[in-house]
């Protein structure tokens, strides 16, 4: 799998949480819909070159059951992830791939597991309640540290969130949410 496809898969994984089986339709999904633009950069490591990709996204549902569409700037969907208790399904032009859970998906795509469940809360500007967090105090930019990541909320009033993990390979996730 080339690095763009792997990173597209990573983007799908980044915004999902829980274990999954594809829901039958978007109408079955509860929770809030988030949409906007997402950019992910994984710095180079001894095993792999630096990778980056950006996409428009629409996230429906919640950490337990939902769907994520990733689109080109012209609106063509190039990856879709669906999840519900039991299985994760990633659909790309290269085919469908099932995973037992999102940790398995992120390990397959990036070679390591990422804190997917936390990202639902991080995109809403708050720490995930499932793990301890530490607020970042002034004069630093507002935000918090959680699970080895620094979540920067300096531009949250502009609907922007940046999460960065410094541990190698460092990973940066930038999201610009559409306003309702």
What are these regions (language model features)?
Residues 20-23, 92, 99-101, 107-180:
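Mature, soluble, non-transmembrane domains
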Residues 34-74, 78:
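Post-signal-peptide N-terminal segment of Sec-exported extracytoplasmic proteins
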Residues 65-115:
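An acidic-aromatic
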Residues 33-38, 52-54, 61, 83-85, ...:
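Extended beta-sheet lipid-handling architectures
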């Amino acid at each position: 799998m080339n690095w763009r496809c792997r990173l597209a898969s990573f983007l799908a994984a980044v915004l999902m949480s829980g274990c999954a089986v594809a829901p039958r339709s978007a109408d079955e999904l509860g929770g809030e819909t988030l949409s906007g633009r997402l950019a992910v950069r994984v710095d180079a490591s001894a095993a792999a070159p630096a990778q980056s990709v950006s996409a428009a996204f629409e996230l429906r549902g919640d950490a337990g059951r939902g769907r994520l569409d990733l689109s080109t700037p012209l609106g063509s969907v190039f990856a879709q992830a669906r999840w519900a208790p039991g299985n994760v399904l990633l659909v790309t032009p290269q085919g469908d791939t099932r995973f037992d859970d999102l940790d398995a998906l992120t390990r397959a795509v990036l070679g390591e597991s990422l804190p997917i469940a936390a990202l639902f809360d991080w995109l809403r500007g708050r720490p995930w309640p499932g793990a301890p967090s530490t607020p970042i105090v002034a004069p630093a930019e507002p935000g918090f540290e959680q699970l080895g990541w620094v979540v920067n909320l300096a531009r949250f009033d502009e609907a922007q969130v940046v999460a960065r993990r410094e541990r190698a390979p460092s990973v940066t996730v930038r999201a610009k949410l559409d306003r309702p």
